[in-house]
């Protein structure tokens, strides 16, 4: 299977699973209309106007961008032209669970944080390049993220110098009926491997990630129980009530720092990692096979 086919397959699986899960909303699914206050219209009693809370939407998007954004879980070295790696990753993201914007969750409670599971595949290419694809699921929800990445190692295996790499990423979320969310960014990382008594290869690594989060909403309604369409006051030309609203596209930047260690036993690779940003901390583990 070619790498292009592999990434396309991950995207197809995510869309299929997201469509199949629409009838099973979980505690971590979104009800974005809660991010607007509804006030009764003075011009049309019994009907409501929407007062959207944009700062809450931006804060929610920023936190979910970290939760569903790219994970690292690999040293700076590439796999080599013939290399192939597949693994399963588990991550837990700790956020400010008392923040007001979590009222937009189905349960209206973020609990202890957010857990995700991820299938991550990487393929080595010529010229110290590496292409990857990922499929991430947010537990207790119907949300998935499809990701792709391209890494270039500027130095690997050269004398005693550490390996150094640059990676670009793009992730998009599917399965959220109210939300459009995507992330893009780049990271730089360094690592150095060493063997221990011929049994295990240990590779500590660290790096920096610049992440850009794009978010917007679809059409929302603070009074879904009221089927009445908005009406126009003939005298003024103004709407008498307007329960529908949209959060326009928002762009936010985030700096993240990460570090971890990979333990390689033959083809079996175990990796532990932590990454930290201003609004969240993510702790991850990975079990993979490096061929």
Region roles according to the model:
Residues 74-75, 86-88, 119-125, 148-152, ...:
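Residues on the lipid-exposed face of transmembrane beta-strands in outer-membrane beta-barrel proteins
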Residues 1-10:
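Bacterial N-terminal signal peptides that target proteins for export
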Residues 97-108, 205-291:
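Outer membrane beta-barrel transmembrane domains
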Residues 25-157:
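Transmembrane beta-barrel domains of Gram-negative outer membranes and organellar outer membranes
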Residues 90-94, 135-141, 152-154, 168-174, ...:
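Transmembrane beta-strands of outer-membrane beta-barrel pores
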Residues 127-131, 157-162, 198, 202, ...:
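Repeated loop/turn-to-beta-strand initiation elements of outer-membrane beta-barrel proteins
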Residues 17-25:
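Sec/Tat signal peptide C-region and signal peptidase I cleavage site
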């Amino acid at each position: 299977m070619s790498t292009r086919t592999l990434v396309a397959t991950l995207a197809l699986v995510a869309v299929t699973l997201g469509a199949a899960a629409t009838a099973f909303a979980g505690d971590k699914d979104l009800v974005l209309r809660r991010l607007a206050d509804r006030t009764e219209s003075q011009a049309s009693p019994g009907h409501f106007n929407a007062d959207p809370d944009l700062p809450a939407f931006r804060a929610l998007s920023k936190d979910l961008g970290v939760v569903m954004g790219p994970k690292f879980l690999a040293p700076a070295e590439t796999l080599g032209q013939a290399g192939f790696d597949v693994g399963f990753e588990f991550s837990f993201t700790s956020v400010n669970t008392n923040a007001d914007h979590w009222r937009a969750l189905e349960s209206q409670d973020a609990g202890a944080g957010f857990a995700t599971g991820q299938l991550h595949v990487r393929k080595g290419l010529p010229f110290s390049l590496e292409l990857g694809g990922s499929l991430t699921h947010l537990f207790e929800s119907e949300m998935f993220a499809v990701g792709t990445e391209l890494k270039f190692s500027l130095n690997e295996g050269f004398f005693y110098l550490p390996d150094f790499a640059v990676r670009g990423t793009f992730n998009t979320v599917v399965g959220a009926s109210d939300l459009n969310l995507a992330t893009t960014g780049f990271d730089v990382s360094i690592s150095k491997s060493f063997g221990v008594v011929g049994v295990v290869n240990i590779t500590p690594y660290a790096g920096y990630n610049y992440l850009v989060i794009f978010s917007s909403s679809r059409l929302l309604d603070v009074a879904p129980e009221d089927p009445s369409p908005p009406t126009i006051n003939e005298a003024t030309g103004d709407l008498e009530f307007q329960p529908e609203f949209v959060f326009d596209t928002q762009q936010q930047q985030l700096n993240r720092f990460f570090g971890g260690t990979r333990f390689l036993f033959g083809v079996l690779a175990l990796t532990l990692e932590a990454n930290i940003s201003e609004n969240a901390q993510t702790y991850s583990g990975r079990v993979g096979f490096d061929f």
